[in-house]
Regions:
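N-terminal secretory signal peptides that target proteins for export/translocation
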Residues: 1-5
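Bacterial N-terminal signal peptides
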Residues: 8-20
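Boundary at the C-terminal end of the N-terminal hydrophobic targeting segment
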Residues: 22-26
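Short, conserved catalytic-motif segment at the N-terminal edge
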Residues: 28, 32-97, 119, 133-140, ...
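Active-site SXXK
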Residues: 44-51, 64, 70-72, 94-128, ...
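Short, surface-exposed loop or secondary-structure junction motifs
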Residues: 134-371
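Short, gly/Ser/Thr-rich active-site loops of penicillin-recognizing serine hydrolases
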Residues: 318-322, 331-332, 337-342, 361, ...
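Short, surface-exposed beta-strand/loop micro-motifs that present aromatic residues
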Residues: 373, 380-390
Length: 446
């Protein structure tokens, strides 16, 4: 075969593969929960708690997925996807994942770092010139004033949320609201993110770069860096570089028409702790099916399923690889899941890496969390975490905004951890004492 013919055949095969519909790739199922060191009886407590929450009208429905050693040990839906329409919650229901988008975008950014196309030490202004001279709202001599930033913001500042950029609440609201910013929501905007990020650069920020941990539009700025470096929209980049290779077939910034019936409804929790259907609009259902598909928020824009997101997190737990597809090196994953901010976040009780909350020491965190765990959550009462020591990935989905007193995301942590009764498959049995007896079993607690 000639070189030209060989190249033509390769191009043809590539086109055929691109035209073929992407098939969902199911994660392997554990033979039993006990086979991977999880108690079936104790996992059943998750089912009970979620069904009780549905019965008491504290949530319409939930999906919980537990992976151990890369195998599905628990995957159950409870309640309704849309109570008013009588649609039952299913394990393939699609959810608005809000800030769980940040991890995906951060991985996308670090892939470009690995390729040598940018550095985390670079000033943001290298890619977004409007960030060359930013300002900060400060209190000086009892008066509030807008002052120049002491230094330029770097890519690392954005990844660690130490750029000083908030969501524009509090004292900054008089600047941000007239400029058209509405917290983290961009789905209904006809402009691309470049226009919004350039506008953001003209507004004062909450803190000087590097001085505080401030949660806000940091990852949205990173998303626009990706767009400017690659020449693609963020949606195109994430689809071609992350979701398609990982076979995350139901993850996107807007729900395709043929999947619209799988999108869960959003509910708001009232003062009495019970739910009502949330209104339309940016703090309710949102325009995730009918929006203009122009602004792709790296900070809060994706929709996904529990299974898709578990595939993404298993890739991270594997050190950047899943089923032969490598997105990152193990060294980069370790860098991303290490604390970069000292005691700036949660007074040191927890740390913050490059896109993830991290646990440095069990017992210091105000909840369950083993050293090395990395996690985050979303505004619609969703959460995820990966525990390298336990070879554990957990994804929990619901759609509450606001969630009010409902705290199922914290409870599911307890419920999963109390079900760990042994090592994952392929790991040695628990250590024995000097008398030859097994060491005391792990106990549960709040």
């Amino acid at each position: 075969m000639t070189t030209i013919a060989a190249r033509s055949l390769a191009v043809l095969l590539t086109l055929l593969l691109a035209a073929a519909p992407l098939q969902a790739q199911a994660l392997p199922k554990a033979p039993s929960s006990e086979a991977v060191g999880l108690s079936a009886e104790r996992l059943g407590r998750i089912t009970t708690v979620m069904r009780d929450a549905v019965r008491d009208k504290r949530v319409a429905g939930t999906v919980t997925l537990v992976l151990r050693d890369g195998q599905v040990a628990y995957f159950e839906a409870a309640g309704s996807q849309d109570a008013e329409r009588g649609t039952a919650m299913k394990t393939d229901t699609i959810f608005r994942i809000a800030s769980m988008t940040k991890a995906v975008a951060s991985v996308g950014l670090m892939m470009l770092v690995e390729e040598g196309r940018l550095s985390i030490s670079d000033p943001v202004s290298k890619y977004i010139p409007a960030f060359a001279k930013t300002t900060v709202l400060e209190e000086l001599n009892g008066r509030v004033a807008v002052v120049p930033a002491k230094r330029q913001i770097t890519i690392r500042d954005l990844l660690t949320h130490t750029a000083g950029i908030s969501y524009g609440a509090g004292a900054l609201e008089p600047f941000y609201t007239p400029a058209g910013f509405r917290m983290w929501y961009f789905a209904d905007r006809p402009e691309g993110m470049t226009a919004w990020i350039d506008k953001l650069a003209t507004l004062p920020f909450e803190s000087q770069p590097g001085e505080r941990w401030v949660y806000g539009y940091n990852t949205d700025v990173l998303g626009n860096v990706i767009e400017r470096v690659t020449g693609q929209t963020l949606a195109q980049y994430i689809e071609t570089r992350i979701t398609t290779p990982l076979k995350m077939v139901d993850t996107s910034f807007f729900v395709p028409a043929e999947k619209a019936e799988r999108l869960a409804a959003v509910y708001a929790v009232g003062e009495d702790g019970t739910i009502t259907r949330a209104p339309e609009g940016h703090l309710g259902q949102g325009m995730y099916t009918s929006g203009p598909r122009a602004s792709f928020s790296a900070g809060a824009g994706l929709l996904s399923t529990a299974h898709d997101y578990a595939r993404f997190m298993q890739m991270m737990l594997n050190g950047g690889e899943l089923e032969g597809v490598r997105l990152l090196s193990p060294t980069t994953v370790k860098l991303m899941t290490s604390n970069h901010v000292g005691t700036l976040y949660q007074n040191g009780a927890l740390g913050w890496g490059l896109g993830f909350e991290v646990v440095e020491q069990m017992g210091r965190a105000p909840r369950y969390g083993a050293a090395g765990e990395f996690s985050w959550s979303g505004a619609y009462h969703t959460t995820y975490w990966a525990d390298p020591a336990e070879k554990l990935v957990v994804v929990f989905m619901s759609q509450l905004l606001p969630a009010g007193p409902v705290d199922l995301t914290r409870r599911v942590r307890t419920l999963v951890n109390q079900a760990i009764v042994g090592p994952p498959s392929g790991m040695p049995a628990p250590a024995t004492t000097s008398t030859g007896k097994k060491a005391p079993a792990r106990t549960s607690g709040q």
